Amino acid sequence: MLIEPQSRYQDEYIFLFTEKPTALQLLSRVLITRWILCLLWFMTLWAEADKLEGYAPEVAALLQEYQDTSDANGSTIPSIFAYRPDSSGRTLIDFESGLIVASSETISGLKQRIVEVLLTQIDPSVIDAHTAYDLGLINQKTKKPFFFNQIKDHDGESIESVWRAERFANFLIYNELRHAGDFSIVLSMVATHKQLAGAKYVRYVLESTRSHQINPSLVMAIMETESAFNPMARSRSNALGLMQIKADTAGRDYFTRIKGYAHTPSSAYLYQPAQNIEIGSGYLSILARRYLVGINDPKKLEDAVIASYNGGAGNLWRSLNSSGNRKQAIARINKMTTREFYWFLTNRHIRSETRDYVRKVRTRISKYEALLTNNGNGALPVAINPIEIIAHPPTGLFFQSRSIA
């Protein structure tokens, strides 16, 4: 049975989408479709903005940054770790700022997310015990949780038991709960969280830097700058782990030039702190003793290594010589004072990221020199043999007697 149109507008609508369209009608369809898509896009933005409303500025910035840069595998910002065991919840951990944002569709799910981050409980369906130990999520000797001492409960106590973790989770849900779509809470680590995080890796740093004869303060400073001590760090370019190693460049170079055979390390290998630090330290040695050989002053060599670790040796040469001539670039470096070369790197290097990187690492080297040589007076809370520090004088980065082919 034919149903008559109820109005002129309905008649025109039926005609528009059932008859063979004219060019004008096709244009109308395109415009209508685009208008609908724009409306949906604005509604999505409004919904996301509404979710961020009410958060402190630094928390909203973290959530927005993750939203803008994440992919199917999680965060591509090295200092941010996103843990999402299922579709109902998510935990974001910012190793740089010390902020933790846990969210879930349900209150019970949120409590589970909070307890997980406080204790890094091992669920075999998510991560097995062996992997957790390898990644440093639980200290193999003390069995302490990964964030032990970095997070304190409402009584100012460190958390290592299920009872205390659940008690603190209940406190947070009762006092800090936020509901905008999902249920969520924001948790802050202690002010010294990065110092405490870095202390976990000092033993590995001392072992690798002794082997490769480089300054441990340099490795600590690079580690903080690259990942803020996030062992699961991953960048958009797939640089991995604490020192942000790219498997097919720095990783392969390490095995070829130091181990003596061609090999590209796996992601699982690079996510293990001891191995990541060993490769990073070895690659710093390769930069100094092969790619940057010829720079005479140890301090200028150290600054050149820092710049090249971030931007590559080729960009260093191009910054100093328009044709990228290595020999001429090195000759120019050797004519500069240490102060002039540092100024050049932080003001004239062709990559702005590298200019900022050199500033950050150089500042942090000074911090770690003080922390490593003054343990016990506000320094890194680990036991360090003074003989190991003496073997790495802070003013002499590399021993010049050894070269890498």
Task: Enumerate the language-model features and the residues they cover.
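Cell-wall glycan-active module
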Residues: 2-224, 232, 289-298, 322-405
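Active-site-proximal beta-strand/loop segments in catalytic clefts of secreted hydrolases
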Residues: 225, 246-248, 309
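Substrate-binding/active-site groove segments that recognize
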Residues: 236-263, 275-286, 335-336, 361
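Catalytic and binding regions of secreted/periplasmic enzymes and modules that target cell-wall glycans
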Residues: 276-325
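Active-site metal-coordination segments of metallo-dependent hydrolases
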Residues: 193-196, 267-277
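Structural recognition of the beta-strand scaffold that forms the well-ordered cores
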Residues: 221, 242-244, 307-308
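Short, well-structured alpha-helical interface segments that form or flank functional binding sites
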Residues: 200-203, 213, 217, 237-240, ...
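Secretory-pathway/luminal and periplasmic proteins that interact with or process carbohydrate-rich
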Residues: 227-236, 252, 311-323
